[in-house]
Design a protein with these regions (language model features):
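An N-terminally biased module of ancient metal coordination in phosphate/nucleic-acid-related enzymes
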Residues: 1-72, 155-162, 167-168, 173-254
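Short, low-complexity, polar/charged sequence segments that are solvent-exposed and flexible
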Residues: 22-25, 78-80, 94-98, 236-238, ...
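Extended substrate/RNA-proximal surfaces in nucleic-acid metabolism proteins
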Residues: 51-204, 208, 269-281
């Protein structure tokens, strides 16, 4: 029974582990199929591929932060070419938007709380390949202003209005397909820390996402119980969508989510249930 995790983050975005550490964790946890899905960047994929042992199947991926009509969502791209021009053009635009958001948050913290970052801290923030509020939260925790990232974001960052810096979902799906990849709706009932939507709320959104070109659903997820998973698997089957699954592992930056955890019970899920892996590895 092969163990898989198709939703993993490194410090190329907002994960705490570098690639070498991540590979060690993957090996120690006996994972045999993995995907690197950093937020809005593909930069780690080539290096990760070179570090992964040969007995582990590595899938190059990305997680794009999107809006599809009025649906705020994350779209995973699997089996992508990280050098694809259309995908990289989109990602480069995203980097500029993230820097604008970063500047807004820095100014907000200064004006609202009198918090000013040192030159070294600012240099570190601006050097991130895909800067997110987690990085700011890390600095606030180091200063002793909060006990963890969640507290730092809740108390200092979340109230800051930054405007919409999400990708247009249709363009994101197009870019993933242009890169030879498979677009999959990530944690479609709600992600880590989010309120899970009801089945009645989900179904109309699913129809919209299908019309925009998604080809799969992340049915197995670290925060989904068996009832939610079975519902999503049925929806995937009814709509001829591929099934994916992942932990959404971020290391210390999202505590309580071990790598390889694909349900709330943390029971082993055979990779054969993730139909997308068979398609990618045997296509």
């Amino acid at each position: 029974m092969a163990k898989a995790d198709l939703h993993i983050h490194s410090n190329f975005s907002d994960g705490s582990n570098n690639l070498e550490e991540l590979v060690d964790i993957i090996v120690k946890n006996n994972l045999k199929i993995v995907a690197l899905t950093d937020h809005d960047t593909v930069s780690g994929n080539i290096e990760m591929e070179s570090l992964i042992p040969r007995d582990i199947n590595f899938i190059k991926g990305v997680e794009l932060t999107c809006t599809v009509q009025d649906i705020k969502c994350h779209i995973l791209g699997y089996d992508i070419n990280p050098k694809n021009e259309e995908l990289n053009d989109l990602i480069n635009l995203g980097k500029q938007l993230r820097k604008q958001k970063l500047e807004t948050r820095i100014e907000y913290l200064k004006n609202k709380y009198g918090i000013e970052f040192t030159k070294e801290e600012l240099d570190w923030l601006y050097s991130r390949r895909s800067v997110v509020k987690t990085h700011i939260a890390n600095l606030l925790v180091k200063r002793g202003l909060a006990s963890n990232n969640v507290e730092a974001m809740k108390n200092y960052i979340d109230a800051c209005k930054t405007g919409n810096t999400r990708f247009d979902g249709i363009k994101a799906i197009s870019a993933i397909k242009s890169a030879g990849g498979i677009p999959v709706w990530a944690h479609p009932l709600g992600g880590e820390g989010e309120k899970h939507i009801s089945k009645d709320e989900f179904l109309p959104k699913l129809n919209i996402m299908i019309s925009c070109g998604i080809k799969g659903l992340e049915c197995y997820y670290s925060r989904y119980n068996q009832e939610e998973i079975e519902f999503l698997v049925d929806c995937a089957a009814e709509n001829n969508l591929m099934i994916s699954g992942g932990s959404d592992y971020h290391g210390e930056n999202k505590q309580g989510i071990p790598i390889g955890k694909l349900n709330t019970e943390n029971t082993l899920v055979d990779s054969s249930k993730l139909t997308i892996t068979d398609y990618i590895l045997n296509f």
